């Protein structure tokens, strides 16, 4: 099996995710990115539930009903000379750990900001996660066809709130009904706005040079205003610096309107030109480089029942190095077994195709009958494990109860499977038979009840429970941990992976426990 093409194939790949606050236009951007990459003939604009046309990237039943992205979809499309892997993340009001984990599987991120609102809470939270790995960030200021905030104010806010330098690449001319287009600072050209709706990409009129009299004819008084503004912008903002971008210290900023199919291509050009090709990763045996010939990858997400007809579960595996070939043998590090994979999948949001080959940077789907977990490492050469993917302590908790007590076994099976997939976390207290469900976002609770009913035929409901937070318990001295387990049993539980967890009714209770047991470590994250 010749792997001579590995370096060439790896260098043309770009793997990124989109991060944004709900309703900043992330799903629309996803559609338009696919449209410009020719993956969609008709980009499905997300409207209310009555519209029969659903966005390509929102494909689970619940998403179709609500018009929101609940699960992470993976889409691959060609653009320019590159092959782009886009990982779509839950973007609605309540998201889940899936979003965090997806950010560990990409090499760069596109941050979408609603130019009328600026930096919002969810964006701040997601940026914190990208900082764990200093991920390079490209920024798209969206919705310029509506009335927006002053562009300079927006850049100032990104710099001060998110602590990252901004380098404007395009600059808007007007806004709302008076939106005329953008000036591209690096190309010294003005691209005039003509709206394209749905799947039509309008021919763009481009005027070269800022002093070109054609510009005055085309946009009137806005031309002189633009020249004055650009003098100010060039003096007050940062120039694009590729090294700072790769280090996650500076973000190139593009302006446009995804709904109007305008500006998305400029941002995509920046992505393929500047974003890093697939990067290597640390393992317990040192670093693996993407262009190494031997295959390796890790599982960052498990999706149950992607196809209701098949009742299956798919493990999403990010290839870190080398090449996957149909029928190849891999070593699954956690269980120490060799497995032969002949039916890996590639995706366009729910449309699955069997895969002949894939390279570092690609995301492949592995059929999972319960033997694969989040964080699992697969290798074809040396045996090693990638540094784990974090589990984040839930922020919300409820007790789950059955309407039919005879279904306890099915309930536990469903909850354990959904927790392995990352839909929620489940905790079983040591002292009683309660089942506590923990989540990062409120909607996860609804998702779990709906899926328990639809996929496991279990009718469940929630009750309030007095829990403020959870912490995973570690200790170097096993005797001390055993002693702690006896003394604090009333507050202890096992999570879905049988890890000891402290369930705190209040933050004060947690502080007191930490003071009382200084030799015990209370962790907010746990590696898979």
Swiss-Prot record:
Gene Ontology annotations for the cellular component aspect, listed alphabetically: cytosol
Residue intervals of the tr-type G domain: 11-279
Classification via Pfam families: EF-G_D2, GTP_EFTU, RF3_C
GO BP terms, alphabetized: regulation of translational termination
Primary location: cytoplasm
GO molecular function, one term: translation release factor activity, codon nonspecific
UniProt keyword Metal-binding, yes or no: no
Keywords: Cytoplasm, GTP-binding, Nucleotide-binding, Protein biosynthesis
PANTHER family: PEPTIDE CHAIN RELEASE FACTOR RF3 (PTHR43556:SF2)
NCBIfam families listed in its UniProt record: prfC, PRK00741.1, small_GTP
Job of this protein: Increases the formation of ribosomal termination complexes and stimulates activities of RF-1 and RF-2. It binds guanine nucleotides and has strong preference for UGA stop codons. It may interact directly with the ribosome. The stimulation of RF-1 and RF-2 is significantly reduced by GTP and GDP, but not by GMP.
Protein name: Peptide chain release factor 3
Species for this entry: Pseudoalteromonas atlantica (strain T6c / ATCC BAA-1087)
Lineage: Bacteria, Pseudomonadati, Pseudomonadota, Gammaproteobacteria, Alteromonadales
Gene responsible for this protein: prfC
